[in-house]
Each structure stands twice: as structure tokens, then as C-alpha cells.
Amino acid sequence: MSCFKSKFAGKSYFRRTFHSSIIQFHPQLSILIWHRRYSIIRTYELIANAAYIGTPGKGILAADESTGTIGKRFVSINVENVESNRRALRELLFTTPGALQYISGIILFEETLYQKTASGKLFVDVMKEAGVLPGIKVDKGTVELAGTNGETTTTGLDGLGDRCKKYYEAGARFAKWRAVLKIGNNEPSELAIHENAYGLARYAVICQENGLVPIVEPEILVDGSHDIEKCAYVTERVLAACYKALSDHHVILEGTLLKPNMVTPGSDSGSKVKPEVIAKHTVRALQRTVPAAVPAVVFLSGGQSEEEATVNLNAINQLKGKKPWSLTFSYGRALQQSTLKAWGGKEENVDKAQKAFLARAKANSEATLGGYKGDAQLGEGASESLHVKDYKY
């Protein structure tokens, strides 16, 4: 706990969190602490870390691509998928001068949690010194859900408690678990919604028992020809089911984060809608389903181009209305595409690539405050669609 106070938010921030969050929700949290046998310090830490990650003006870098997925990225820039190249890319990102002031958390793949810089410093220590919380991907991917039309459920609950304990000891303070749903004529089915919602809830409570803030990620794929109204309807159904499941499992909502898709038309719909329309439908879906106790919503980019993801986030934050949560980002491809293009696996391109990453991080920071002016769209690859059908990490 002292590590958190001194290296991430400071004692004054911790005290503010204690008084505003703990005392305000004291009756509810006392019951949860008794029921789940959380220590009082553990509860404080979960809530403070979740609030810190959701700090306005900051967001999450999702650098948790599996070895196979990062290999596909490397193919596009003619780079061999070996450990040294994966480490070099991570170091490029994590050591970009000035960039981590816009980042509150970084989601890591297990390999990266234990990797070091070329000079021998653990990446986790680099993050801590910059005031960035390390996170970890804990799911084991998806498998087909029997009795459905190709729908999936996420695996990884077996042994999750032991893994979370190990990751916490290694420095991780939050976790991510991705559930995937699709829109079709009869999808998502009630079975798929229920199975994925309860899987997310079981994951969330196991994380909290072991000190990790769970990011709840029910991603509704953009694949399909549906319109934006259909996406909004499905998003509301899925989020409502998720929060019912989280309640049933006695998850402390103040110590969680939500990572949803934005509400957009399907990739095959042929429909182009303005950012203001996406913002209206997205915020309305959240207003109808997400409790105010949740400190932050960290959007996934869902295959949008870097620029689309930033512009749409900016529109969401400019929209007037009730928004009791911080609305920020948890982007992977939408923070790294122009950086990858600039780098190309060459040492002499590191400075150029870091400038591209800094520009995107700053742009998304501005978007979380509704102040992005469009001045980061000139980077190579910034307007390139990143959609991959049936995308898997």
C-alpha cells in the first residue's frame, strides 16, 4: 500500500479518496468487506487505484497483445516476431519522453510483465517511476459456446486466483478480461449474454479478492451490416446483464472499470455517421445501464482508425448531459498504428516513432477533456482503418 501512496497518487490523493469514497459508501462497503472478507486497506486500495486510472486527461495504453497477435502486426512492417523485437517495441513505447504523462495505466501481456529495458530495468519499475499503474491481461482467449451460432465464451477462470496473486506480487494493480459478442439476425443470444456476463463477474470478484482492479470488457464486435440503433439496443442489453451479474457476485463497483465498445453502425452497413451521433447513442446507452458508482468508462477502439477513435472520444466528452463517470480510453491499435509504421523495426527510427506515439497519446488526453482540435491526424497510418473481422488478441 505504501508503494501505491508514494509512487502513484501521493498521500493527499489517498486521503481524499478515503474521505469521499469510503465514508460516503460506508454502509454498503462494510457489508461487502464482511461478506468477501476483504481487508479495509485492500478495499481502499482498489477504489483509489480505479479512481486514479480514470483520471481525466489520462487513459490506458493496451499493450497486451498476445505473441501471435503482435506477430501479425510485425508482418505488416516486415519485422521478425522474436522476443527481442517485442521487447524493443515495448521499450520504445514505455520510454517515450513526455508520453506517460498522458497515460494512467498500461495493460501488459504476461511476457512483458517480467521483461526489462536494454539497460536492465524492469518495465514495471519504469511505469511506476512515471506514475503509471501496470495492468495484466488474465483471460485465456475465447472458445465456441455450445448450442449457439458460432458465439463464444471466454476461458481462464481455472487457476485465476493464483495467477492474480502472482501478478500482484510482480507489480500489477489492475487486470483485463475480454468477453466477445456479435450482432446478427438472432445474436447475441440470451445464452451468450448470460454466460459472458457471469464470466466477467466471476473474474471481477476473483481479481478484487487478490488486490487487482478488474476492467470489465464486454466487447460487441463491429462486424455486420446492422445500423447504429441495433448496436445501441444490443449494447444496453449486454451492459444491463453485466451489472446484474456484478451485483449478484457482490463486486465493489467503485473498484472496477468498464471497457465497452462505442455505439457505431456495423462495418458492412455502408453507413457513415457523424461523431456527434455516435456520442449521443453511446452516452445514452451508458446512462441507461452503468451505475454512477463506477468511476470510469475506458473505451476500446474496436478497429476504428487512430483518428476516428480520438475524434469520437472527443465528441463523447463534448456532449452535454449526465455523465457521472470519467470517459476516457483504453486503446491498443489506435495508439500504436502510426508508431509501428514510423518504427519499422529499425533502431534509427526510434525517435521518429516515439514522436508519433507522443502525438497520439497527447491527442487522446485532449479528447478525454473534449479539447482535441484534430492536430494529430497527419501521422502516417492515423486515418487507416484498423478493423479486422472477428478480431482476436
UniProtKB/Swiss-Prot annotation:
This enzyme's EC code(s): 4.1.2.13
Main location: cytoplasm
Database matches in CDD domains: FBP_aldolase_I_a (cd00948)
Pathway: Carbohydrate degradation; glycolysis; D-glyceraldehyde 3-phosphate and glycerone phosphate from D-glucose: step 4/4
Positions carrying S-glutathionyl cysteine: C207
Site, Necessary for preference for fructose 1,6-bisphosphate over fructose 1-phosphate: residue positions: Y393
Catalytic activity: beta-D-fructose 1,6-bisphosphate = D-glyceraldehyde 3-phosphate + dihydroxyacetone phosphate
One GO BP annotation of this record: glycolytic process
Expression tissues: Highly expressed in flowers.
Residues reported to bind substrate: R73, S301, G302, G303, R333
Description of what induces expression: By glucose and fructose. Induced by abiotic stresses.
Record's comment on post-translational modification: S-glutathionylated at Cys-207.
Subunit structure: Homotetramer.
Sequence similarity: Belongs to the class I fructose-bisphosphate aldolase family.
Function of the molecule: Fructose-bisphosphate aldolase that plays a key role in glycolysis and gluconeogenesis.
Protein name (record): Fructose-bisphosphate aldolase 4, cytosolic
Annotated source species: Arabidopsis thaliana
